[in-house]
Amino acid sequence: MKNQFENNWTSGNNGYPLFNEEVEKYISVLPSENQVRLAENPFYCFIHFGMNTATAREWGTGTETPSDFTIESIRPEQWVKSIKAAGASGIILTCKHHDGFCLWESEYTDFSVKNSVFNGDIVKMVSDACKDINLYFGVYLSPWDMHEETYGTEAYNDYFCNQLTELLTNYGEINEVWFDGAKGANAKAFEYDWQRYYALIRSLQPSANIAICGPDIRWVGNEGGKTRKSEFSVVPKALCMAETVSKNSQHSEKDAVKLKTLTSMDEDLGSRKVLANSEELCWYPAEVDVSIRRGWFYSKNENKTVKSGRKLFKLYLSSVGKNCTFLLNVPPTNQGVIHHKDVHALQSLGKKISRITAAPILIENPGQLTDKDGWVDFDFGSSRKLKYIVLKEDIRKSQRVEKFDVYIKKANGKYIRAASETIIGSCRIIALKGKKCIGARLVVRQSRGNPIIPEIGFYE
């Protein structure tokens, strides 16, 4: 009888080289320390709040006036407590959306909270509230500005950098800067000076990751929470430009030609086939951004569209549990609080996340699997109801595993395959719904070099 584990990564590596010059190139691509820290804190929340909250719109027009911002008070302490209850580690605030209205008292425009009925600096209030309960704070600053008169001229790059400097110097440590690639069809053709923006961030906030239209975190490609079967972090370097030259962002014909065969929405971004055709590679992990409601800004008409804790948990498993980060948008109301339905959903999500690792059966460190290892066995000591398996690669040594199986061992000694997956990356969560077993076996079928797995945990 054929051994069911015979086709392991040591005997053929699924038909791919385990080591060669190309493989060495792939596994030489490593994350920065900022990106490692991101992987260790993969769940955080978006706060869409601003002029659109007051006017009940998703996108403003840029023709609003400060008097249209009729919100007089907010409760940021309620925001951060609700978000921390969900298990999130930080917040990113929309400091300026496309309409151009600023939630801080900027020196460079009158279109801000300083000329509204609101008495205070919202960015400071939220950043202070984050510090009070140990959440990190990030900023969203829309490059597209429908209000600013200099938009479309070189002077706008100066304006944007001035505002970026205000945000990066007045509110303590900034963990992430989120650049949106959205741009209206009728907006002026204009190329943002991205390299200048990046250099400014690296200078003023060297620990900050730059997301989406930036070199550190890529957009997963949709806003519905859908992830690929294989979300690779090692991808062609050209993908780092994909959002900055997209049809909704910049309109540089020369750059667009370079990217005509590669976008954030492509299904395959990091397989060996794709990487083999790419001269330069980079570490560029995916971020899954999705709203707890139908829209991104609060609308009372969407109170019935709040996603349940169960739905949010599925999104968590398919993002954090598949080598991505999870950015969940939670929009406060025009009364300055997070709606009670959203709060309930966040609390439910937090409880479900905490249950993943609440009851450990066994946590092991297989370490580096050598070419003499066919598989790794795990003995539970007695019959247990296995609900979750959590695997982690040492991403400081790159992303290596391309295909693996997990088998569970029944009381009669037989092995049953419980999961057949592709990548692991920074975190892979496998849900098994309480399968009874006395042990388990990990078989790596395909890898780029020797797999390095510092942690695999089994939980009931």
Which stretches of residues belong to each language-model region?
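Short, conserved beta-strand segments of beta-strand-rich sandwich/propeller modules, principally
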Residues: 439-441
